[in-house]
């Protein structure tokens, strides 16, 4: 009896499971059949090329919104902005209505967008020729006739770049959407939300979106008005990369130019250093030329700074050549030192610049008076007493010795004079180096401040 009961329970459970499975399968089959019947009913005689309205005077209201997922690139050279977006579009199709009770309670269906009438909304500022730019995904059709279609799209839109304050610049790029063929009497655009949806936005490493808003407008052509929606993206560049690898090296090069005047003029590296700095600046200019657009309307901030430094370095080379020329002057090169140069560069300016003349200046006695006196005494003695032959020989020897001493004295004085002139010109060159060191240092600091401070103030102000 117990065994029979067990067999009965097992058979009952098996039959119950089979009944549930058959019921579920029948339910699914019923839903599929209802959906198939609904699609045949909706698209029987449906013409996607005709506006789905009851009356020809009716206007289809398209609710339009934009969701940005990624700011792919901002190309200043070609003045392009590349974005990945979702286009939110919703309208009512009067030909796609049904009673859910007649089709198993189906309230919505997914339909390929190629089979539906579409408002042919395109991006007007397209730069790559793909005006539609979107993927033909499926649309959701509700029983009330409401069609919701949110295709993803990748756009390259034209954007006029203002690189005046590069790399502390801010750009305002816009995306203008509208129907390509329908005017305002057929299709009207209505903004879902004036703000661009950025919930799923993937941050860009170079640019930051400060603001992104949409605004509706109308473009008139004769008697017709064409509605459109313009989304404005306010972008701010993150300047850390360019500050570290462009601006700071340029600042370093400008201060290297100042250090040229700290090198001794005896060294031959003064001109080599200046020339190397000039070549480095030329390389930086080539790098910037590859980044910014080729425009004659504005000069970018970093371009102004590099131009300033190049003029700065060129002047330093000219001044260095002049200082080296002064350093190697002497009386033998027919450059005697004028009295005013001695007073200014050997007496006054060294005191003001806290410089000390390393030369120990001393003067030799003239010796002309002593020579005349000696000659007079010798002649007097010869007149007073008649000299013997031995005395005459001794006097002649002494006169020759005196002449030799005078020659040596004149030679020593001449060498001392030449050495003193050479050292004086070298000291004048040192004074000039010190003067130009301070002048170029002040000019470098003030020039950097005057060029960059306004841009930094603007960038910080916009940040706050």
Swiss-Prot record:
Gene3D superfamilies for the chain: Neurotransmitter-gated ion-channel ligand-binding domain, Neurotransmitter-gated ion-channel transmembrane domain
Chief location: membrane
Spans within the Cytoplasmic topological domain: 327-434
InterPro entries: Neur_chan_lig-bd, Neur_chan_lig-bd_sf, Neur_channel, Neuro-gated_channel_TM_sf, Neuro_actylchol_rec, Neurotrans-gated_channel_TM, Neurotransmitter_ion_chnl_CS, Nicotinic_acetylcholine_rcpt
One annotated GO molecular function: acetylcholine binding
Biological process terms in GO annotation: acetylcholine receptor signaling pathway; membrane depolarization; monoatomic ion transmembrane transport; neuromuscular synaptic transmission; presynaptic modulation of chemical synaptic transmission; response to nicotine; synaptic transmission, cholinergic
Annotated keywords: Cell membrane, Disulfide bond, Glycoprotein, Ion channel, Ion transport, Ligand-gated ion channel, Membrane, Receptor, Signal, Synapse, Transmembrane, Transmembrane helix, Transport
Membrane topology reported for the UniProt record: Multi-pass membrane protein
Signal sequence annotation: 1-30
Function: Component of neuronal acetylcholine receptors (nAChRs) that function as pentameric, ligand-gated cation channels with high calcium permeability among other activities. nAChRs are excitatory neurotrasnmitter receptors formed by a collection of nAChR subunits known to mediate synaptic transmission in the nervous system and the neuromuscular junction. Each nAchR subunit confers differential attributes to channel properties, including activation, deactivation and desensitization kinetics, pH sensitivity, cation permeability, and binding to allosteric modulators.
Subunit organization: Neuronal AChR seems to be composed of two different type of subunits: alpha and beta. CHRNB3/beta-3 subunit is only able to form functional nAChRs when co-assembled with another beta subunit. Participates in pentameric assemblies along with CHRNA4/alpha-4 and CHRNB2/beta-2 subunits and with CHRNA6/alpha-6 as well, forming stoichiometries such as (CHRNA3:CHRNB4)2:CHRNB3, (CHRNA4:CHRNB2)2:CHRNB3 or (CHRNA6:CHRNB2)2:CHRNB3.
Protein's recorded name: Neuronal acetylcholine receptor subunit beta-3
Origin species: Rattus norvegicus
């Amino acid at each position: 009896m117990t065994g029979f009961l067990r067999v009965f329970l097992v058979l009952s459970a098996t039959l119950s499971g089979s009944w549930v499975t058959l019921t579920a399968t029948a339910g699914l089959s019923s839903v599929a059949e209802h959906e198939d019947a609904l699609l045949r009913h909706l698209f029987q005689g449906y013409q996607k090329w005709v506006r789905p309205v009851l009356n020809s005077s009716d206007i289809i209201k398209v609710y339009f919104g934009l969701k940005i997922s990624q700011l792919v690139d901002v190309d200043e050279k070609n003045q392009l902005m590349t974005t990945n977006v979702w286009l939110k579009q919703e309208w009512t199709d009067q030909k796609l209505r049904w009673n859910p009770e007649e089709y198993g309670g189906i309230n919505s269906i997914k339909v390929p967008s190629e089979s539906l009438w579409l408002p042919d909304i395109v991006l007007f500022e397209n730069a790559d020729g793909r005006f539609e730019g979107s993927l033909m995904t499926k649309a959701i059709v509700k029983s009330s006739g409401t069609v919701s279609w949110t295709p993803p799209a990748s756009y390259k839109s034209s954007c006029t770049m203002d690189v005046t304050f590069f790399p502390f610049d801010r750009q305002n790029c816009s995306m203008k959407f509208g129907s390509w063929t329908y005017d305002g009497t057929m299709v009207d655009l209505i903004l879902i939300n004036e703000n661009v949806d950025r919930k799923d936005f993937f941050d860009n490493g170079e640019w930051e979106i400060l603001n992104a808003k949409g605004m509706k407008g109308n473009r008139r052509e004769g008697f017709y008005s064409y509605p459109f929606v313009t989304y404005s993206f306010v972008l701010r560049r993150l300047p850390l990369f360019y500050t570290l690898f462009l601006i700071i090296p340029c600042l370093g090069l400008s201060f290297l130019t100042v250090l040229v005047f700290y090198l001794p003029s005896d060294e031959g590296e003064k001109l080599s250093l200046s020339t190397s700095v000039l070549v480095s600046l030329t390389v930086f200019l080539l790098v910037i030329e590859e980044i910014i657009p080729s425009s004659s309307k504005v000069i970018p901030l970093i371009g102004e700074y590099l131009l300033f430094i190049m003029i700065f370095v060129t002047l330093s080379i000219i001044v260095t050549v002049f200082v080296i020329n002064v350093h190697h002057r002497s009386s033998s090169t027919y450059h005697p030192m004028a009295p005013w140069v001695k007073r200014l560069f050997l007496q006054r300016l060294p005191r003001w610049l806290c410089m000390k003349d390393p030369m120990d200046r001393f003067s030799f006695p003239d010796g002309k008076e002593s020579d005349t006196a000696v000659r007079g005494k010798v002649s007097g003695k010869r007149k007073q007493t008649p000299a013997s032959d031995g005395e005459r020989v001794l006097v002649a020897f002494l006169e020759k010795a005196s002449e030799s001493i005078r020659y040596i004295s004149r030679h020593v004085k001449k060498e001392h004079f030449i050495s003193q002139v050479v050292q004086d010109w070298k000291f004048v060159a040192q004074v000039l180096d010190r003067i130009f060191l301070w002048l170029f240092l002040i000019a470098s600091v003030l020039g950097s401040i005057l060029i960059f401070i306004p841009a930094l103030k603007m960038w910080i102000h916009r940040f706050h």
